[in-house]
From Swiss-Prot:
The keyword Membrane appears for this protein: yes
Chain ranges passing through the membrane: 4-24, 36-56, 68-88, 100-120
A cellular component annotation (GO) from this entry: plasma membrane
Stated name of the protein: Fluoride-specific ion channel FluC
Keyword Phosphoprotein on entry: no
Residues holding Na(+): 75, 78
Keyword terms: Cell inner membrane, Cell membrane, Ion channel, Ion transport, Membrane, Metal-binding, Sodium, Transmembrane, Transmembrane helix, Transport
InterPro entries to which the protein is assigned, alphabetical: FluC
Length: 125
């Protein structure tokens, strides 16, 4: 039980730090669609798609690595709660168009990036 817990903790710590750094560096550039939040959600989609495809292709790999990457890294890095707060903030400010654009960009983009992750693994390996 300790190895899976450590895997999630290590991945989660790395993911949280990545998310924080990107938010600090990028989100002020464009407050209507904060690029740091968008980037972590899109990259997280790509990583989780590629990881699941990789582990399906190579099932003999220690499952703790999958936990580290999917539950830990992607769980710590991606952020539905911050995305939700940003959309609500846009709605409260009357920026309805940007709220809709944000929802469509995050959801559609993340789904497409997850598909791309699966596709990349099948293409390259």
């Amino acid at each position: 039980m300790i190895k899976p817990l450590l895997a999630v903790m290590i991945g989660g710590c790395a993911g949280c730090v990545i998310r924080w750094l990107l938010a600090v560096r990028l989100n002020a550039w464009f407050p209507n669609l904060p690029p740091g939040t968008l980037l972590v959600n899109l990259v997280g989609g790509l990583i989780i798609g590629a990881t699941v495809a990789w582990f399906a292709r190579y099932p003999g790999i220690d499952p703790n690595w999958k936990l580290l990457i999917t539950t830990g890294l992607c769980g710590g890095m991606t952020t539905f709660s911050t995305f939700s707060l940003e959309v609500v903030t846009l709605l409260q400010a009357g920026n309805y168009l940007w709220a809709v654009i944000s929802v469509l960009t995050h959801v559609t983009g993340s789904l497409l990036m997850t598909i791309a992750g699966f596709w990349l693994v099948s293409l390259l390996f």
